[in-house]
Each structure stands twice: as C-alpha cells, then as structure tokens.
From Swiss-Prot:
Protein's recorded name: Thioredoxin reductase
Annotated organism of origin: Buchnera aphidicola subsp. Schizaphis graminum (strain Sg)
Record SUPFAM superfamilies: FAD/NAD(P)-binding domain
Major enzyme class: oxidoreductase
InterPro entries linked: FAD/NAD-bd_sf (IPR036188), FAD/NAD-binding_dom (IPR023753), Ferredoxin-NADP_redctase_2 (IPR050097), Pyr_nucl-diS_OxRdtase_2_AS (IPR008255), Thioredox_Rdtase (IPR005982)
UniProtKB keywords: Cytoplasm, Disulfide bond, FAD, Flavoprotein, NADP, Oxidoreductase, Redox-active center
Length: 319
C-alpha cells in the first residue's frame, strides 16, 4: 500500500455532511482530504426528486444535488479520494486510517459516514428501490398524492411517516409484525383517530412476504397474518411502500474507539462550541452517524458545517 501524505484534516463520507464539511474546511485553508467511502453521494443518490432543498424550488434529483456539492467542494480545492476506510486508530496521534487502497494520517477527523435504512431483506426490494420503495416520507411522500400506499413498521418513525402521509395520500395500509406499537402514546392516539376515518387500514401481526410490480414500479404487496393458520397470503394493491423499521449507522469500525449509543456516535453538544466533538479530542462527527431523529439533507449539511468549524478551532489550538 502506498502511504499518503499526512493531512491536517480528513473527512470520511461524501454525503451532504461530508461535502459541507469539506467546503468549509477548504475555505479555512485547511486543505482537507475527503474520502468518499463505498456509497459516494450517500442516501440522496437513491432519491429521484427533491423539492425541499432551499433555493431549488424547481425539481432536482438527488444525484444532481450531490454532484453540485461535489463540484462545489472541488472549486475550493478539496482533495477527493475514492477509497473505503476499513479500520482506524484514534488512541494515539497522529490519527491513523487504513483504507482498502491506501494508508492515511491526520491531525483531525470528521466522521460523516452516514446511516443506511434497515430494509426487510426481501429479494424483490432491490428491484424497486427508487421505483416505489422509499424510506423517507418527507422526501418522497408528495409524489403519492391521492394514491394508495403502504407503510411497514411499528415504532415512532413508522407512525410519524403514516401521520405525515395521511395528509395527501388516498389510503394507507400500515403493516406491523406485532400486535402492539412500540411508539409514544400520543402518536398512537393520533394514529387511531385517523384509523377511525378508514384512511389508515391496520394489518397487525402481519409481515410482507413479497413485493410485486412492473417496469413502472410497485403495484402490489403480498402480506401474511401470523395469527392465521392457513398459508394464504393477502394481496393488496399499492403504488408505493415506505419502509420504516429503523436505520443502521455506518459506525462499525469506530465501536472500539468512540463512545456510542445504539450505534450512533455520541458527541459533546452543549452551548459553548465544540458541539460535534466525540470523546476523543480531534475526532468530530456529523450527519446521520449522530442523528437518529431528523435525518434530512439540510440537517446533515448543517452539522457538517459545525464539525468543520469545530475542527478548525481545534487545529488552531494546536499551533
């Protein structure tokens, strides 16, 4: 492996948080190195249309937005490397990162490796991702106006997605593998009010067995009720499926280095700056690796900006 030159700061990840951190770090003359990771561009690369990015009132695709961020970071001379980090050493300085192709050292790190949605694990899911299967109602819900769709999940996220979608879709089939929801009572109460209107149809103790469709996208779901002894499956017609069964942060390689909670990196927070610092000085985190609540492109970008500013202050303190 070739040993790369030492860098003041390395940014891991090429989603909104990573690119924003790169832009701010570059403008601060820190000459950052951004390592893209496996999924260049992050989750937005699977989003067909974005209508809630401030200033872009005309439709823009996820890949288009990420390409613009990529070009923006290059404008300010960010060095971008296509590699995937497989192990790190943060317990001594300089920090050491081992990639699939090269080795890297640096004085500061911003972790923006993102989080991937947890899917059902059906073989038919990959076929319809971006063509009827979504993991973000706020991002894609509007495109199902006056259509019948399904939501799968039983926690806060699933119910929140259902409540949001109920504002403009025709009907929602909410599918949950258990008999009871694992969500806040206030959310369940709101859900049950809508259930009474028959706009939301509950399928409890049920699982999705298969996803059917054509070249245009999803058309039907096959679901099975676990309480029924017969093996017959119910076929329901839907235009889309929103999967809301949780997220998996891309933080496995940091588990023995950083403090975490449920796979998400814990940061300092507070009101006196250094908000994005982890338990190790010089290691900062931004985007979906620290956020299991909002998970929006704009909130990821905001935290990427904060991490860049925090890391700049840290590096200045070393000189």
């Amino acid at each position: 492996m070739e040993l790369k030159n030492h860098k003041k700061i390395i940014i891991l990840g090429s989603g909104p948080a990573g690119y924003t951190a790169a832009i701010y770090s570059s403008r601060a003359n820190l000459n950052p190195l951004l390592i893209t990771g496996i999924n260049k561009g992050g989750q937005l690369m699977n989003t067909n249309e974005i209508e809630n990015w401030p200033g872009d009132f005309k439709k823009i695709t996820g890949p288009e937005l990420m390409n613009r961020m990529h070009e923006h970071s290059l404008k300010f001379k960010t060095e971008i490397v296509y590699d995937n980090i497989i192990s790190v050493e943060f317990k001594k300085k300089p920090f050491f990162l081992l990639g699939e192709y090269n080795k890297y050292t640096c004085d500061a790190v911003i972790i923006a490796t993102g989080a991937n949605p947890r899917y059902l694990g059906l073989s038919s899911e990959n076929k319809f991702k971006g063509k009827g299967i979504s993991t973000c109602a706020v991002c894609d819900g509007f495109f199902y106006k006056n259509k019948e769709i399904a939501v799968v999940g039983g926690g806060n996220t699933a119910i929140e997605e259902t409540l949001y979608l109920s504002n403009f879709v025709k009907k929602i089939y909410l599918i949950h593998r258990r008999n009871n929801f694992k969500a806040e009572k206030i959310l369940i109460d709101r859900l049950l009010k809508i259930v009474k209107t028959k706009k939301v149809i509950l399928h409890l103790n049920s699982t999705i067995e298969d996803i059917l469709g054509n070249n245009k996208g999803v058309t039907h779901l096959l679901i099975k009720n676990k309480n029924l002894k017969e093996k017959k499956k119910l076929k329901i017609a839907v235009s889309g499926l929103f999967v809301a069964i949780g997220y998996i942060p891309n933080t496995d390689i940091f588990t023995d280095q950083l403090k975490m909670k449920d796979g998400y990196i814990k940061i300092k927070k507070g009101t006196h700056g250094n908000y994005t610092q982890t338990n190790i000085p010089g290691v900062f985190a931004a985007g979906d690796v620290i956020d299991h609540v909002y998970r929006q492109a704009i909130t990821s970008s905001a935290s990427g900006c904060m991490a860049a500013l925090d890391s700049e202050r840290y590096l200045n303190s070393l000189s």
